[in-house]
């Protein structure tokens, strides 16, 4: 691009111009700083020689050179000489020309004062005083820049130059002749320039000190009070505490809270100021806090600091006015329900304010409801783990804040809430909850509990309830009110108010409007007490139908009776209660509370009350209420403890007698009263309450009336062991300790009882024995003619039931002495006939009873003989048949029959020692017996049946298929069914006892399953012969390979078919045990309410592990292989159970599991030649085994690592020795080694560590040898698609394990390896070895396989997948590995294909770029050198060289964006020099766009203060472009103009302080644009550009773009306004609004969106090298040479 040339025909002027050009060219050849002085001197001489010319030629170039000479990096001598040249130029051009060319000459001079030394400050001041002050109003465009530059000289008042600066500033303001604009500049400086706030404060205080108090606000509050307020808010929020103190002092002394100008400020701005002032308490600085309090109170700073709080008196109305806005601001914070920080901030501010009571009392009453509501919300809603500390701090400060509120305010708030409740307003529910919340924490919130207020509120609420008719609408509020009343009960004593004639508190009386409820006169506490009693009695009558409210009122009434001695109320309450219980209008819940809370003295003195209570209890019993039994017993025991008499016992006895007399039928034994006796048998008070009723029942039992039915009574006694104990205690006076010493009889020949009974002795023992003797006699006489006569079955039932409570030896007792061989023989024959020929019994109803009796009697008789009898063997078979022949029934009689049968069977089996031979038909009977027992779920029967089956194991093993397989399979089905239906079973059995019982049955069957399978496996264990002695395991696969199941296995000593059958059965059983072990995961039992299933999960797991341990002992390899199959079929959670099982089975020796997995792996190598059953080999593959082994190894920790390493080492060496055959398994081996590595260095010996490193290197080499050989371009795409589909399936169904690279190795070799290296290997590479050289070598080998070929082939970025980028990324996280990838990376980076990457890829590569650059910073110098115009290459075209420079500049830009902030500070000077040379030496402006992008990146990644040398260059270039575009004879492309506008947009949006000092050069002052609409100033340069664009416009304005920009301005974040594609209309709109936008961005306190700024640069860099144009009116294309590589 051509620079601006002054057109003049004057030969002297052309000579002058040439001389200037030569001087300017010298500045581009500077090598050392003395050269600057030399060149400045020559320039000065040229100017002196041609001093007759007012206009200086090439003024923009001269001003740029002078601005560069004022760079902070140059010595003060250069600065002094430069200022001298400036002074001379200003002298020769004069004020008029300087005014016209102010933007040309001032942009380099104005920022200098802040960096100047003492030697040059005076020179600068003289220039401003001499040349700028004289400009008058012409200084307006640069006034703020000059003013800000001078503020840095005011930081030290003691400095002599400071006074000179003060006077100079006053002069500038004076000559400007516009105080409004001047103060606008000052306030905007405070708002937008944090570094200049100290100087601005000093000037502000000086001006205010020199003004009269009444003139300060009229002179200073300009041009807008909102701007002033926001400036103060920004300054008080500054990070520098000294700045905060200074501006708080200014507020205190000159802008007090009562200032009139605040009335003109918008509420939002004023609230912003108040919250900024209030937020200074968060700094925990006492001096700031004092200033805050003083400002709120309207005091001066000195007054507040010198006078104690007690002497400060401020009018309350004034304080209320002062704090009105403050209160609104805090209220806004407290209303932010979703902001935890807002709550914390509000609580902190108010808590700090509470230390100043004069201030706090003003807002106390107003803010209390908000604080309480917010604190309640905080404690009930917020539960954030990620901000736990903030949450706890907010809760703590909130609680402490509420404690700061006075008790009177809290009571006032309570009174108001009570009034709302009583008034039945729409807020009554919220008010009730608020009262409840306060009272719940009253011990924290109140200093002391006011008993009078509590009683008054209590009475008022009761009166309100009395007036409110009960309905569903108020039920919730009523319950809340009653909850409040119960809390208030603890705050006062009834007796205190009973006879208290003192008047109630007048404040409470007025606040609660109690006068309206009582007659005129003095209202005393005694009157309230009486009213309270009446209300309670009324409520008891009123809320009878609402059981909840009624119950709560009853509790309150009982509390009054308990604490107050009020006979009158007691009598009325008892009368009401008795009537309620009599007519059943009061619920049973009320009865329970009534008995528990009523004092004992009332119960003892009121027989009628006790009788009514007992009547209600008996009525409840008669209602057959099963679920009320526990409640009834609780009431009975409570009543007995309070009465301490036998009145309850007498009452129940009377009721029983009445029932017996009235009913005269067996139904008496079915009444719920007997269930009550059964449940209460374990209570210590049983004998005091139930002895006499129990005696009545037993007396009826002992009567010999033929019509009496004893069945129900005997069943009832037998149903509870505790009740049996009570019966025995009652009959025998602790019979357990006085039982008779009966001598057992050994044989029939000598069978003679040696126990003598004296019937004349009437003690309990003798009487009971005689009683049982009579029973035996009746049995003998009765069964003589049993079968033919059905009429006596009823009597037989009675006799049999009575025998249930006899002792075993009692049947053998006769009168004094007696031989009874014939008696026993008769009984045995009788019992055998009943047991073996049940068909002879005609009535099925009683068959179970008769057979049960026969079995029990037979058991007693058989036990007399020591040796087995002949009939016992046939009796066992008969028992098997009996189970099949007898019809099953859910009745209790069938249950008793089975129990007797199992007892007899176990007894006979123990006597015969298993010496029983069964025929095939008898085997069937045995199988049926076993299956029936397996299917039985009765909690009482099943364990005994299973125990009997264990005794039958020797018989079961005789016929494996019939007797073992079917029961095992039925058990497996039972387990599956039980676990699948556990939820429905819980609903079926709500009683915990039944839950436990069912679980006990299940556990017993689970153990039986394990024992059956283990016994069968031990019976058919295979021992390989000599030819197969080298096998390490004998599972199914091992047996297949070894030929055990082949046709030629004739030499095998076991039944192969039986063994095969049992191994397959064991697989099913093992899966069943695993299902039980992992049931707690599948069932999600944690969400259930059943305590049984939760507590029994550990028992279930223990039983399952025990069975698995037995399987593993019998068949270790087969057990492991089956677990591998389960591992493959289940999800991730269940797989964790597999590892737990492996750990349990290995018993701290995990190498055995690894050894068995390895054996299984190699055994499968020969499966292809096997012709046996396919089901034995098709379930799992070798890869499946390795996957399982890898996961298992990953979970081995600690010292166990050294145990498994040997086995893994052998296995891996075997694999890599035949890598071609086992190439599909190399990745799994590598993964296993990686998992072992985490513990090798810690727990293994040094020799193992060396072996590990050697093995890892060989394995990695083997893996990489087979990689990189695929040519399929879609391989990675298919791999990613497979990954995504698998991941989606896992998220939706949760039915399979998370996809691992291991499973994809065979099909997708390269991408699965890359995935493994990125996700597992490289992140853990430091765990593999401590030798960095080894690690670097391994990383290099990986890079050489996956990255280097792509680099050499130049196929990136298309061939660089996300995995390749991830690999570079994870490698870059280990700096010492950079040697492995840096060379390839720099080849990628230096190739122009870099610019074909997308933004996301470049962002992902950012850490890689930064790491590479950090370790080779010299690369940056190389790029700078290659980008310099002075570097050329022989035999290279100009376009190629230009393209190389463009690409290298863009590379530097990418480097800049990839690095952290201020990383390039050491290299900043050469970078800025590069920008200078390229901008000033680029004749066609081709590099402008690239340089502008680089400047944007530099501004984004470098602190603005470090870029001071750069800004003059940038500003001058913008000046040149904009001025040139406005000139008709200079060709500037719109593309270049757009680039310049984007740069200006970027820098103004960043709000860099140092650049903001130069914005006035090209754009209108924001103050002029906002407040004066630009009427007071000349058109800015950007306005002229906009008009020029308008002249050339070929399209209408795009209104939509304007509106979109307005929406951007209202955002809380700042982003660049101009996009990559920008129309003329959008550009004009931007230029017209840039000043206003800049002001609004500062005014609104918006923050920058870093990512948007970065993306804007990335997009334009990448677009620069694409074929698409940058904008619709782009006129310059990237050179064709950009497609080539950089040089």
Swiss-Prot record:
Major location (coarse): Golgi
One Gene Ontology cellular component annotation held by this UniProt entry: cytoplasm
Coiled coil regions, renumbered to chain: none
Biological process annotations from GO: endoplasmic reticulum organization; Golgi to endosome transport; protein transport
Pfam family, any one: DOP1_C
Compartment list: Golgi apparatus membrane
Keywords: Golgi apparatus, Membrane, Phosphoprotein, Protein transport, Transport
Modified residues (Phosphoserine): 1671
Topological type in the membrane: Peripheral membrane protein
Disulfide bond residue pairs: none
Record-linked InterPro entries: DOP1, DOP1_C, DOP1_N
Primary role: Involved in cellular morphogenesis. Required for traffic between late Golgi and early endosomes, and for the normal structure and organization of the endoplasmic reticulum.
Homology family: Belongs to the DOP1 family.
Protein name: Protein dop1
Origin species: Schizosaccharomyces pombe (strain 972 / ATCC 24843)
Lineage, broadest ranks: Eukaryota, Fungi, Dikarya, Ascomycota, Taphrinomycotina
């Amino acid at each position: 691009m051509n620079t601006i040339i002054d057109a003049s025909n004057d030969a002297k002027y052309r000579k002058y111009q040439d001389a200037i050009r030569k001087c300017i060219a010298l500045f581009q050849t500077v090598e050392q700083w003395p050269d600057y002085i030399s060149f400045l001197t020559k320039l000065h001489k040229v100017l002196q020689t041609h001093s007759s010319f007012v206009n200086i030629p090439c003024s923009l170039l001269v001003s740029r050179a002078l601005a560069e000479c004022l760079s902070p990096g140059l010595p003060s001598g250069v600065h002094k000489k430069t200022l001298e040249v400036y002074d001379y130029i200003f002298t020769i051009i004069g004020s008029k020309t300087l005014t016209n060319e102010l933007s040309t000459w001032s942009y380099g001079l104005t920022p200098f004062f802040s960096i100047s030394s003492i030697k040059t400050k005076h020179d600068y001041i003289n220039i401003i005083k001499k040349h700028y002050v004289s400009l008058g109003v012409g200084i307006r465009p640069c006034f703020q820049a000059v003013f800000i530059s001078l503020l840095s000289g005011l930081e030290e008042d003691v400095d002599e130059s400071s006074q000179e600066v003060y006077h100079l500033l006053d002069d500038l303001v004076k000559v400007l002749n516009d105080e409004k604009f001047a103060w606008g500049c000052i306030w905007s400086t405070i708002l937008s320039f944090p570094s200049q706030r100290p100087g601005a404060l000093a000037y502000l205080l000086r001006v205010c000190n020199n003004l009269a108090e009444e003139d300060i606000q009229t002179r200073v509050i300009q041009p807008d009070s909102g701007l002033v307020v926001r400036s103060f808010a920004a300054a008080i929020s500054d990070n520098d505490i000294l700045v905060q103190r200074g501006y708080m002092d200014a507020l205190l002394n000159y802008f007090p809270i009562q200032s009139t100008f605040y009335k003109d400020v918008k509420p939002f701005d004023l609230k912003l100021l108040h919250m900024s002032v209030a937020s200074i308490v968060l700094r925990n600085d006492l001096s700031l806090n004092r200033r805050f309090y003083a400002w709120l109170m309207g005091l001066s700073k000195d007054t507040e600091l010198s006078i104690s709080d007690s002497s400060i008196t401020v009018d309350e109305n004034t304080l209320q006015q002062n704090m009105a806005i403050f209160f609104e601001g805090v209220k806004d914070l407290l209303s932010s329900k979703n902001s935890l920080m807002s709550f914390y901030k509000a609580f902190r501010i108010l808590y700090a304010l509470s230390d100043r009571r004069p201030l706090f009392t003003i807002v106390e009453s107003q803010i209390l409801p908000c604080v309480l509501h917010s604190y309640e919300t905080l404690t009930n809603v917020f539960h954030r783990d990620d901000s736990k500390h903030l949450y706890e701090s907010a809760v703590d400060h909130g609680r402490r804040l509420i404690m700061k509120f006075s008790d009177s305010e809290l009571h006032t708030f309570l009174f108001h809430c009570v009034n709302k409740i009583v008034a039945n307003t729409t807020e009554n529910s919220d008010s009730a909850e608020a009262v409840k919340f306060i009272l719940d924490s009253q011990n924290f919130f109140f200093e002391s509990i006011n008993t009078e207020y509590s009683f008054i509120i209590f009475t008022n609420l009761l009166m309100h309830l009395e007036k409110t008719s009960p309905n569903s609408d108020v039920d919730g509020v009523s319950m809340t009110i009653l909850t409040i009343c119960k809390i208030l009960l603890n705050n006062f004593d009834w007796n205190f108010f009973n006879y208290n004639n003192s008047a109630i508190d007048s404040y409470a009386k007025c606040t609660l409007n109690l006068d309206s409820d009582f007659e005129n006169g003095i209202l005393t506490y005694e009157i309230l007490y009486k009213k309270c009693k009446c209300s309670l009695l009324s409520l008891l009558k009123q809320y009878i139908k609402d059981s909840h409210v009624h119950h709560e009122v009853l509790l309150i009434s009982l509390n009054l009776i308990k604490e107050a001695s009020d006979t009158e109320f007691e009598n009325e309450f008892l009368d009401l209660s008795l009537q309620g219980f009599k007519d059943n209008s009061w619920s049973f819940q009320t009865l329970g509370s009534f008995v528990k809370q009523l004092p004992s003295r009332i119960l003892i003195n009121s027989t009628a009350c006790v009788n009514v209570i007992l009547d209600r209890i008996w009525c409840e019993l008669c209602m057959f209420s099963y679920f009320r039994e526990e409640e009834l017993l609780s009431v009975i025991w409570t009543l007995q403890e309070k009465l301490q008499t036998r009145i309850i016992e007498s009452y129940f006895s009377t009721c029983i007698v009445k029932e017996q007399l009235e009913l005269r039928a067996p139904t008496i034994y079915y009444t719920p009263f007997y269930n009550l006796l059964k449940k209460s048998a374990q209570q210590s008070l049983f004998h005091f309450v139930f002895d006499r009723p129990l005696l009545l029942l037993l007396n009826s039992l002992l009567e010999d009336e033929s019509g009496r039915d004893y069945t129900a009574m005997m069943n009832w006694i037998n149903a509870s062991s505790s009740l049996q104990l009570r019966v025995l205690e009652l009959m025998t006076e602790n019979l357990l300790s006085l039982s008779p010493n009966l001598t057992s009889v050994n044989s029939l020949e000598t069978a003679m009882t040696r126990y003598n009974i004296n019937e004349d002795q009437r003690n309990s023992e003798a009487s009971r024995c005689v009683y049982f003797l009579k029973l035996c006699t009746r049995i003998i006489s009765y069964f003589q003619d049993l079968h033919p006569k059905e009429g006596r079955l009823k009597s037989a039932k009675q006799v049999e039931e009575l025998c249930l409570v006899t002792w075993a030896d009692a049947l053998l007792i006769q009168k004094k002495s007696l031989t009874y061989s014939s008696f026993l023989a008769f009984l045995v024959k009788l019992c055998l006939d009943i047991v073996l020929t049940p068909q002879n019994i005609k009535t099925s109803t009683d068959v179970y009873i008769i057979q049960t009796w026969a079995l029990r009697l037979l058991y007693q008789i058989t036990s007399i003989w020591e040796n087995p009898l002949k009939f016992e063997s046939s009796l066992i078979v008969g028992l098997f048949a009996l189970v099949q022949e007898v019809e099953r029934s859910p009745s209790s009689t069938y249950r008793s029959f089975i129990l007797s049968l199992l007892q007899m069977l176990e007894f006979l089996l123990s006597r015969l020692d298993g010496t029983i031979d069964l025929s095939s038909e008898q085997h069937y009977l045995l199988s049926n017996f076993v299956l029936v027992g397996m299917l039985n779920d009765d909690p009482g029967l099943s364990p005994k049946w299973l125990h009997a089956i264990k005794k039958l194991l020797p018989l079961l093993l005789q016929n494996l298929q019939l007797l073992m397989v079917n029961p095992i399979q039925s058990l497996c089905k039972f387990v599956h069914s039980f676990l699948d239906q556990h939820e429905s079973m819980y609903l079926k059995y709500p009683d915990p006892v039944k839950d436990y019982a069912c679980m006990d049955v299940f556990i017993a069957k689970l153990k039986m399953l394990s024992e059956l399978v283990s016994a069968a496996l031990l019976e058919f264990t295979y021992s390989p012969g000599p030819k197969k002695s080298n096998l390490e395991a004998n599972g199914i696969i091992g047996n297949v390979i070894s030929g055990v199941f082949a046709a030629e296995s004739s030499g095998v000593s076991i039944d192969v078919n039986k063994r095969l059958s049992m191994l397959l059965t064991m697989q099913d059983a093992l899966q069943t045990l695993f299902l039980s072990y992992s049931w707690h995961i599948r069932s999600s039992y944690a969400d259930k309410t059943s305590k049984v299933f939760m507590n029994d999960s550990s028992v279930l797991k223990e039983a399952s592990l025990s069975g698995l341990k037995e399987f593993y002992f019998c068949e270790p390899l087969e057990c492991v292989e089956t677990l591998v199959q389960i591992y493959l079929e289940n999800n991730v959670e269940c797989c964790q159970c597999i590892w737990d099982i492996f750990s349990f089975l290995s018993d701290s020796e995990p190498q055995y599991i690894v050894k068995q997995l390895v054996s299984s792996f190699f055994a499968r190598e020969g499966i292809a030649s096997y012709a046996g059953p396919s089901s034995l080999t098709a379930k799992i593959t070798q890869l499946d085994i390795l996957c399982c082994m890898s996961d298992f190894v990953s979970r081995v920790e600690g010292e166990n690592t050294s145990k498994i390493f040997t086995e893994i080492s052998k296995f891996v060496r075997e694999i890599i020795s035949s890598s071609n055959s086992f190439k599909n398994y190399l990745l799994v081996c590598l993964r296993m080694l990686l998992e072992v590595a985490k513990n090798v260095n810690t727990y293994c010996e040094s020799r193992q560590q060396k072996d590990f490193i050697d093995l890892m290197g060989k394995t990695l080499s083997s893996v990489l040898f087979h990689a990189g050989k695929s040519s399929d371009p879609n391989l990675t795409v298919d791999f990613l698609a497979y990954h995504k589909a698998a991941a989606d399936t896992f998220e939706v169904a949760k039915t399979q394990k998370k996809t691992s690279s291991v499973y994809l190795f065979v099909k997708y070799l390269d991408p699965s390896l890359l995935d493994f290296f990125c996700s597992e290997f490289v992140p853990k590479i430091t765990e593999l070895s401590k030798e960095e050289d080894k690690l670097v070598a391994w990383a290099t080998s990986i890079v050489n396989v996956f990255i280097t070929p792509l680099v050499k082939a130049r196929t990136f970025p298309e061939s660089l997948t996300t995995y390749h980028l991830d690999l570079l990324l994870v490698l870059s996280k280990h700096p010492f590995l950079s040697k492995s990838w840096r060379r390839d990376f720099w080849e990628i980076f230096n190739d122009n294909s870099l610019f074909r990457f997308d933004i996301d890829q470049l962002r992902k590569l950012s850490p890689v770029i930064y790491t590479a650059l950090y370790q080779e910073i010299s690369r940056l110098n190389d790029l700078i050198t290659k980008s310099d115009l002075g570097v050329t290459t022989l035999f290279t075209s100009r376009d190629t060289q230009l393209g190389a420079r463009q690409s290298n500049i863009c590379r530097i830009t990418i480097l800049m964006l990839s690095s952290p902030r201020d990383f390039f500070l050491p290299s900043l000077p050469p970078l800025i020099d590069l920008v200078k040379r390229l901008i000033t030496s680029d004749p066609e402006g081709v590099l402008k766009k690239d340089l502008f992008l680089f400047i944007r990146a530099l501004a984004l990644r470098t602190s603005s203060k470090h870029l001071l040398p750069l800004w003059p260059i940038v500003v001058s270039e913008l000046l040149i472009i904009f001025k040139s575009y406005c000139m008709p004879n200079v060709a500037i492309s719109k593309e270049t103009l757009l680039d310049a506008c984007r740069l200006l947009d970027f820098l103004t949006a960043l709000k860099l302080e140092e650049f903001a000092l130069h914005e006035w050069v090209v754009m209108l002052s924001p103050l002029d644009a906002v407040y004066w609409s630009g009427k007071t100033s000349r058109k800015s340069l950007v306005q002229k550009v906009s008009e020029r664009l308008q002249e050339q416009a070929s399209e209408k304005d795009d209104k939509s773009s304007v509106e979109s920009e307005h929406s951007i301005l209202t955002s809380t974040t700042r982003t660049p306004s101009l996009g990559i594609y920008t129309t003329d209309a959008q550009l004009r709109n931007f230029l017209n609004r840039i000043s206003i936008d800049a002001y609004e961005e500062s005014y609104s306190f918006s923050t920058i969106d870093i990512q948007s700024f970065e993306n804007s640069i990335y997009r334009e860099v990448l677009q620069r090298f694409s074929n698409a144009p940058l904008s619709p009116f782009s006129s310059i294309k990237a050179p064709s040479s950009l497609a080539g590589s950089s040089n």
